[in-house]
Amino acid sequence: MVAEKETLSLNKCPAKLPTRTKLLAQQPLPVHQPHSLVSEGFTVKAMMKNSVVRGPPSAGAFKERPTKPTAFRKFYERGDFPIALEHDSKGNKIAWKVEIEKLDYHHYLPLFFDGLCEMTFPYEFFARQGIHDMLEHGGNKILPVIPQLIIPIKNALNLRNRQVICVTLKVLQHLVVSAEMVGEALVPYYRQILPILNIFKNKNVNSGDGIDYSQQKRENIGDLIQETLEAFERYGGEDAFINIKYMVPTYESCLLN
């Protein structure tokens, strides 16, 4: 009888329950979670009740590709280039051992363009500066070499490395204005050059309220691509725009508008 009275009193006054008993009463009963089955899409397992379909793998459009040994590095280490490094108050520059105008452009210019894939000093410096020097003094020697430059340009862009792409875009802008008819000679090769530009065209850096120093250094990849496409259109002749538009659908003409 005493035990029954205690039980009744506890039922009537739940506030007098021990703390541990109260906590246990407040906790919800455990619910058994069914085991989920991860499966590939469009399979029989994917149609089962507890299956979770695995998403598609990343396409890797912006993923950097591994670099390969370049012919430029091999020739440089072998001492086959008539160049040396010269220091002055403005920084490093190339000291040419021969007159640039007398160089065999069919031999040297494609090799220097092959060095656009380089990312380490001094190879990347010699390749980049050597190209600009040769384009500055090449004149009518540049146009016949254009077909030999396309594969090195394509290889450099296909690395998908931001630094390499920016350097290559600046080289392309210089190449277009380096001699007459060069811009028009590049039009048939847009299908090999422009796909990577189409991928990275909108990859601008959003710095918010901060200062974007990449714009001052001309290293903002989206802006450089826009400048390069506009240079192609200006110097590529009447067929340039339609061919650019075919490969980069979001490009708008800088001449027609």
UniProtKB/Swiss-Prot annotation:
It is found in: Cytoplasm, Cytoskeleton, Cilium axoneme; Cytoplasm, Cytoskeleton, Flagellum axoneme. It comes from the Eukaryota. Keywords: Cell projection, Cilium, Cytoplasm, Cytoskeleton, Flagellum. Expressed in trachea multiciliated cells. Transmembrane segments: none annotated. GO terms for molecular function: actin binding; alpha-tubulin binding; beta-tubulin binding; G protein-coupled receptor binding; Hsp70 protein binding; Hsp90 protein binding; ubiquitin protein ligase binding. The keyword Cytoplasm applies. The keyword Cytoplasm applies. InterPro entries: Parkin_co-regulated_protein. GO terms for cellular component: axonemal B tubule inner sheath; axonemal microtubule; cell body; cytosol; glial cell projection; manchette; neuron projection; sperm midpiece. Microtubule inner protein component of sperm flagellar doublet microtubules. Forms a large molecular chaperone complex containing heat shock proteins 70 and 90 and chaperonin components. Interacts with STIP1, PRKN, GPR37, HSPA8, TCP1/CCT1, CCT2, CCT3, CCT4, CCT5, CCT6A, CCT7 and CCT8. Interacts with MEIG1. This is Parkin coregulated gene protein. It comes from Bos taurus.
